From Swiss-Prot:
Belongs to the herpesviridae portal protein family. InterPro entries: Herpes_Portal (IPR002660). Its main location: virion. Homododecamerizes. Interacts with terminase subunits TRM1 and TRM3. Residues 1-26 have a biased composition (Polar residues). Residues 1-35 are annotated as: Disordered. It comes from Human herpesvirus 6B (strain Z29) (HHV-6 variant B). This is Portal protein.
Length: 662
């Protein structure tokens, strides 16, 4: 984050104005006009600076050749929708919600405040409280042991201290906005860069805080430890973490610097995981970016499953094909019905079909004679057909007539076939030209449909919307998808078809993506999975490493809170009351009370000439059990059991540098 320079135009102008007013001997009216001119100049400079800060994006290069836009992007918007279950549900969403749990932040602040306040109590303050109690209720040694007298006071002062500190912690926790930490985690998991804005800090009103305190001891401690309480109140009230709306984050390729803007105004940011540039392509290093390829594959499979479900919802799907059951007789019947007066082409086709049906010489001869009579009756030799007229002619004349008939028949057949072939060739060429023209038109129409007429079909959100639409509407949309009609030859058969409902199984893919998501989060943020004796998962919680990876940077780098001790992992399984009790039991107050008890016991023994045993029951006056484990110390045993059960490890917190570093 860039800080404003101390040598700003405002400082320089105001400094010169003061020097002129002190050194010059001008009249008051003239000095007043100079002041007005100077103020006008200052306002102009401030206006120019404000305009520059608000319109800084207008000075960016108009093209994207010199910057890499980190956010917004389609990939990150998809990540955000996945995390919050906008279109699909994943097991990783529950793990992400466990990571967003702001109760961990509250317990961290409660632990740090309680630890700092309780350990700041001095033995002199404990002794003063004891003296105040003795003055109000002196010990008279009448059927009351000093042990009972002191234990009542020790228990009372304990309840007062814990009650006041609990009120202070609740007052602080009320100023925590849960959404800020939630957005902090969302930015880390998706972009790796957390934008934030600092408002003008206002001095915290300790009077309202001290109203929660009833004892003078805690009152003095809070005043003495303002360096603990004040930064917490300032940090919680002066930092705002925005959501994903109107935020722009980009990287300058030349300077390799990252900048963040909200509504065209530069804001501060915290880089948790720096993006890389590999092969001139920006690559994020966040958990969601690592899962992105697998998530895309899984989404494609889910869309395929939904589409198959919708397409195969109808009860029956039938493939129809033309059946080759047209006989020669049917062909002849169709020809005769179409036109009674057949032309030469149809006669030729009829002749060829008759020949194919003829199985004897007589049938062939009848077919030939019928064809000749139909197309050219004049070429038939009447002498051959009318034997009574040609019986006296010579044999040579008959042979010559037969040869003439054969030649005419041959020529007629060849002529018909040539005409038919030529006509077919012309028609084929014409059809080719027409087919090419229509293919171009069909391609043009398809392109128009894809861009204009069928927007829903090519909507990028269509695949996701199918899950949320009603069944009837989803079916209407899916029916617009194109189908290809395939002709099947007689020599081929259908090997596979959707005669029955087919839906791809995604059970294995769902289980795999859940395992990948869980593994990525658990290993990136070192979360802890808590299981029972049967190995079944009970919960997912923060570990010591998770606190150092997420909570500590949030407090130090964003809220500028440096004096809080990290909460141990076993304390996360306790309530706020149990946390305070555990801190008190392990604090130095118990040792101070023991010291005061021994000291006062010795003094009272000298005053009343008492022995080390009680005068009535002969029991020892000094009983160390007053400070030994009691039922209230069960909380320490609980913490010990949790530590052993979870096998919790502790580590040293890293030292983050003070100040905002982006």
């Amino acid at each position: 984050m860039h800080r404003a320079s101390a040598n700003s135009p405002l400082n320089s102008v105001s400094g010169s104005m003061m020097w002129r007013n002190q050194s010059s001997g001008r009249r008051p009216s003239k000095r007043l006009s100079d002041n007005e001119a100077t103020l006008s100049t200052i306002n102009s400079i401030l206006g120019a600076e404000d305009m520059l800060s608000k319109n800084l994006l207008s000075y960016l290069p108009p093209n994207n050749e010199e910057i890499d836009m980190i956010y917004p992007s389609e990939q990150i918007m998809t990540f955000i929708e996945m995390l919050h279950g906008h279109k699909n549900f994943f097991k990783g969403q529950t793990i992400h919600n466990a990571l967003r749990d702001s109760a961990v932040l509250k317990k961290q602040i409660a632990y740090g405040v309680a630890q700092a306040l309780l350990n700041s109590v001095s033995i002199q303050q404990i002794h003063d409280e004891w003296k105040r109690h003795v003055r109000s209720f002196p010990f008279h040694n009448k059927k009351l042991s000093f042990q009972d007298y002191f234990s009542v006071w020790a228990h009372a002062i304990k309840q007062v201290i814990l009650g006041d500190i609990s009120n202070i912690i609740n007052f602080i926790l009320q100023s925590i906005d849960n959404s800020h930490y939630n957005r902090y985690v969302d930015w880390i998991c998706t972009v790796g860069i957390v934008p934030f804005m600092r408002t003008t800090p206002t001095a915290p009103n300790l009077y309202n805080l001290l109203q929660q305190v009833s004892s003078k001891l805690i009152h003095d401690i809070v005043r003495h430890k303002q360096n603990i309480v004040t930064p917490i109140l300032l940090g919680l009230s002066s930092v705002i973490i925005p959501d994903f709306h109107n935020i722009k984050i980009f990287r300058d390729r030349n300077s390799e610097q990252i900048s963040c803007f909200k509504n065209k105004k530069a804001i501060a940011f915290f880089t948790y995981s720096t993006p890389y540039v590999i092969r001139n392509r920006l690559m994020l290093t966040t958990p969601l970016a690592h899962l992105s390829p697998e998530l895309k594959k899984h989404n494609s499979l889910r869309r395929h499953q939904k589409m198959c479900q919708l397409l195969n919802t109808f009860p029956i799907k039938v493939l129809t094909a033309a059946k080759t059951d047209v006989t020669n007789k049917k062909i002849m019947d169709m020809i005769e019905k179409e036109e009674k007066n057949s032309d030469a082409k149809k006669s030729l086709i009829k002749f060829l079909l008759n020949l194919s049906d003829s199985k004897s010489k007589i049938g062939i001869r009848d077919s030939v004679e019928g064809f000749i009579q139909e197309i050219t009756p004049s070429i038939i030799d009447q002498n051959k057909l009318m034997l009574n007229r040609g019986q006296f002619r010579k044999r040579s004349a008959i042979d010559t007539g037969e040869r003439d008939v054969r030649d005419l028949f041959k020529k007629q057949i060849i002529k018909c076939m040539e005409e038919q072939i030529q006509t077919q060739m012309d028609e084929i060429e014409t059809l080719k030209t027409t087919n090419q023209m229509f293919e171009r038109k069909i391609k043009d129409l398809h392109s128009l449909l894809e861009t204009n007429n069928d927007c829903d079909r090519y909507n990028p959100d269509l695949d996701h919307d199918l899950e949320n639409l009603s069944l009837s509407r989803a079916l209407n949309i899916v029916q617009r998808l194109p189908f290809t009609s395939v002709s099947i030859d007689d020599t081929r058969s259908v090997a596979n078809s959707f005669f029955s409902q087919y839906i791809p199984d995604t059970q294995y893919a769902d289980k795999r993506i859940d395992q990948l998501w869980e593994m990525e989060y658990m290993r990136t943020f070192r979360l802890r999975k808590n299981v029972n004796n049967q190995g079944q998962e009970e919960s997912i919680t923060y570990s010591n490493y998770s606190i150092e990876l997420l909570i500590v940077p949030f407090l130090r780098r964003l809220l500028n809170i440096y004096n809080l001790e990290s909460i141990p992992e076993e304390f996360l399984f306790l309530s706020l009351g149990e946390i305070l009790l555990a801190i008190y039991e392990s604090s130095k107050i118990k040792h101070y009370l023991r010291l005061v008890y021994v000291r006062e016991l010795n003094q009272i023994s000298e005053v009343y000439n008492l022995t080390q045993t009680h005068p009535e029951n002969n029991e020892p006056i000094f009983d160390s059990n007053i400070f030994s484990p009691n039922p209230e110390n069960e909380i320490l045993e609980k913490i010990k059991r949790i530590r052993n059960l979870r096998r919790i490890q502790h580590l040293t917190r890293p030292n983050y540098p003070k100040g905002d570093q982006d």
